[in-house]
């Protein structure tokens, strides 16, 4: 039982994780295998399962990883460790969640009357899976490390999919045409046409993710050349 988790972690990291994250996962489980070995556990006073390491303070490194390094990695590790602790709550032995501040155990005694333990364990498992699913849905792209705080600020190294700041780029051409790039939403092209007496502006929206599809039909705006100067700088 002691070596089953390190072996599973090594195999899973080699098969499913990207190359830059395999070393981190292998290091984590190798370190875990030494800590959980029989002699070290007995010397450290953690030789029994569901004791000192099953507490709220164990979650702090994974919360920091989620906030300051990478949302995807932090969410995966945080959901895995927290679900393990929550499932330990569902056992009669329980675990000391606030150890060492409070050494009392939080547990569920399945021997009382009412609905059976299978139904309650199934309901708990469904709730945990739903929470993990929400973390996966709202996590950003896994191809580049992006922390949660940088995503909130809209300045992460990965794809920022919730930024609120305005960044508009204007590209003026010599013939009066204008490109407006309101990143990251798309582009607006203003086509300037002049016949000497009047000028026509045609607006066309282009989506960055839609491979050049028009967001709306071209709209024409005609102005008298003698009443208003050219505002596009062309």
From Swiss-Prot:
Residues 212-234 are annotated as: Disordered. InterPro entries: YdjM-like. Residues 220-234 have a biased composition (Low complexity). Keywords: Plasmid. This is Uncharacterized protein ORF4'. It comes from Methanothermobacter thermautotrophicus.
